[in-house]
Every structure is written in structure tokens, then in C-alpha cells.
């Protein structure tokens, strides 16, 4: 419908925040066309709505449905198809918004829902800097170990590093160590873009919050995300728990 774009992924009639972004990025070159612009702004509106429904989910239904493809605990909202928390799920809508904004200069997507979604993303990333205090749990029965989180749904223990925790990778497989470095770098960048949008929306407090969080994540990667390889020297780790 006008102002609302729902993009299914493959043969699954659900929308992933990550996949829906990737599925329209190649249309940005045509975003000067009104119909394409409407499609992208409709998707940004739907992504913001989904984040406000549940920022820890990775995939959503078009409409509420009590059908669940998996036996997950705790049971997710009827709007949610799957509730695997992945950092990049929250980064991708901001990534799309920034690319669209840079290409067109349009700001019609900067709605109150988008504003609230930005604040939600920043709040979740900050919460997950100290995962021990997080409300998020995820357990799935009768599945491979990569489809569930150990430790009663909390995942393996992690130390505080300044980075933000992720339950799952972009592949939807569970993180072995809670700090997924590439996704933290993605978050670092998109928080800077979020700060720009926050200022466009007149929210200086949110802009500063996003910038502070971005700097903390960057410092965390510098301190805990590097490894000295005997052959290749200083390289970035893929994942770390910050525990040495």
C-alpha cells in the first residue's frame, strides 16, 4: 500500500531488516523516479515500524499471525517471524536511509516513527554493551547448536569492552563469542549516520548519544578486536568475548 513497502525474502513470506535493505539498494540509482522513491520510503517506514514492534527480532510478518515456524522461547510477538538478535538487523535500515538521503537529498522518511526507531536502536546497542543486564533471551528446541543460544538463552559469557553484543551473525547462526567485530564496525558507522538524522530531526541529545556510543564501540574494537598474527601482523578478529 502507499507509504508501506513489505519486501519478502526469497520463498519465505517474511521480511528481514537486512535482506529487505539489500534487495532494494540497487534501485537507488533510479530513486529520482517518484515511484521508486515511494517504494524506498515505504520500506523505510515499514522497517521503522518493525523496529518499534521488537528491536531484537530479525524477521517480521506482514500482518500479525499466531503461526510460528519454530518452537522458540520466549514466544515472540505475532508480528515477528523470527527473533534472532543480530546487530546488522538494526544497522541496515539506517544504512539504506543514509544511501537514499545521499542520493536524493529527500527527507520525507524522517518521520516520528523513524525518529523513535533511531532512539530505540541507540538504546538497544547501549544496553548490549553490558549483556549481563539485557532482557534478551533466545532458546530453540530440536535444532542444531547454531540455531540457539547456550547458557539458558543468554549466550556465552562476555566481558564489558565498549563493543555491543550480538546473539547471531548475519548468516542467522549463533555467535560463538558475543562481540562480532565486523558488525560492531557497521554499528559504529551507522551510529554516526544516525546522529546526522537526529540533528535533522532537532534531537541534539540523541545525536550526542549516538556519537558517544559510536566512539565507545570504536575504542572497544581497537582494544579488544585486534590480534597479532605471526605471519600477517595486526589483523581484526572476527569475534571476541573480551575475556582474553
Regions found by a protein language model. Name each.
Residues 43-46, 213:
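Short acidic/histidine-centered micro-motifs embedded in hydrophobic/aromatic stretches
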Residues 2-12, 60-84, 135-176, 228-244:
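Carbohydrate-binding/catalytic loop surfaces
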Residues 54-58, 126-143, 177-179, 189-244:
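Catalytic cores of carbohydrate-active enzymes
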Residues 19, 89-96, 183-186, 190-194, ...:
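Amphipathic, well-ordered alpha-helical segments in soluble domains
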Residues 106-108, 114-166, 170-188, 192, ...:
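Helix-rich catalytic cores of soluble enzyme domains
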Residues 13-40, 47-147:
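Aromatic-rich carbohydrate-recognition surfaces in CAZymes
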Amino acid at each position: 500500500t502507499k507509504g508501506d513497502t513489505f519486501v519478502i525474502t526469497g520463498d519465505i513470506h517474511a521480511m528481514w531488516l537486512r535482506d529487505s535493505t539489500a534487495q532494494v539498494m540497487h534501485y537507488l540509482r533510479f530513486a529520482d523516479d517518484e515511484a521508486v522513491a515511494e517504494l524506498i520510503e515505504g520500506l523505510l517506514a515499514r522497517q521503522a515500524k518493525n523496529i518499534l514492534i521488537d528491536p531484537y527480532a530479525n524477521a517480521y510478518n506482514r500482518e500479525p499471525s499466531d503461526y510460528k515456524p519454530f518452537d522458540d522461547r520466549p514466544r515472540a510477538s505475532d508480528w515477528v517471524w523470527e527473533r534472532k538478535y543480530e546487530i546488522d538487523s538494526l544497522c541496515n535500515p539506517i544504512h539504506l536511509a543514509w544511501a537514499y538521503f545521499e542520493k536524493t537529498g529527500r527527507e520525507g522518511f524522517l518521520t516520528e516513527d523513524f525518529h523513535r526507531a533511531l532512539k530505540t536502536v541507540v538504546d538497544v546497542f547501549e544496553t548490549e554493551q553490558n549483556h549481563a543486564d539485557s532482557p534478551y533471551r533466545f532458546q530453540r528446541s530440536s535444532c542444531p547448536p547454531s540455531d540457539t543460544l547456550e547458557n539458558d538463552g543468554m549466550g556465552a559469557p562476555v566481558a564489558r569492552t565498549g563493543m555491543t553484543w550480538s546473539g547471531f551473525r548475519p548468516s542467522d547462526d549463533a555467535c560463538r563469542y558475543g562481540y562480532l567485530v565486523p558488525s560492531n564496525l557497521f554499528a559504529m558507522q551507522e551510529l554516526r549516520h544516525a546522529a546526522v538524522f537526529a540533528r535533522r530531526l532537532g534531537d541534539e541529545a540523541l545525536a550526542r548519544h549516538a556519537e558517544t556510543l559510536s566512539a565507545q564501540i570504536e575504542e572497544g574494537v581497537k582494544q579488544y578486536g585486534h590480534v597479532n598474527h605471526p605471519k600477517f601482523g595486526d589483523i581484526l578478529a572476527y569475534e571476541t568475548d573480551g575475556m582474553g
